[in-house]
C-alpha cells in the first residue's frame, strides 16, 4: 500500500480552507476537512481513483454540499502526494 502525503502547497491550501470555513460556516469546517482527508487516504489503495489531468497529475473530486473540492495529486511507486486542494469553483 502506498503512503499518502500532503505536499507543502496542499498543506497551505488546507489551512486556508479551514480558516475560510471557520469564518463562514464553523459547523462545516471540521466535516469538510475530515471528508477531504478521508478521500485522500483512499488513494493509498486506489491511486487511479481520480481522473488524469496530465501525464503526471491526477484530480479527485470530493463532493461536499452543492459543490465540492478538487485534490490534485501525483502518483509515485511508494506514495501519493497531494499537490493542491481547492474548491471546485475556485479559479485555477
From Swiss-Prot:
Deletion phenotype: No visible phenotype when deleted singly or as the relBE3 operon.
Top-level taxonomic group: Bacteria
One of the GO biological process terms: SOS response
Pfam families: ParE_toxin
SS bond list: none
Keywords: Toxin-antitoxin system
Family: Belongs to the RelE toxin family.
Function per UniProt: Toxic component of a type II toxin-antitoxin (TA) system. Its toxic effect is neutralized by coexpression with cognate antitoxin RelB3 but no other ParD or RelB antitoxin.
Protein's name according to its UniProt entry: Toxin RelE3
The encoding gene: relE3
Amino acid at each position: 500500500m502506498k503512503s499518502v502525503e500532503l505536499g507543502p502547497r496542499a498543506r497551505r491550501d488546507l489551512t486556508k480552507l479551514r480558516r475560510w470555513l471557520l469564518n463562514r460556516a464553523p459547523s462545516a469546517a471540521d466535516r469538510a476537512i475530515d471528508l477531504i482527508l478521508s478521500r485522500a487516504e483512499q488513494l493509498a489503495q486506489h491511486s487511479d481513483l481520480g481522473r488524469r489531468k496530465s501525464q503526471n497529475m491526477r484530480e479527485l473530486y470530493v463532493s461536499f454540499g452543492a459543490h465540492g473540492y478538487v485534490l490534485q495529486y501525483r502518483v509515485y511507486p511508494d506514495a501519493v502526494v497531494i499537490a493542491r486542494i481547492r474548491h471546485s469553483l475556485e479559479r485555477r
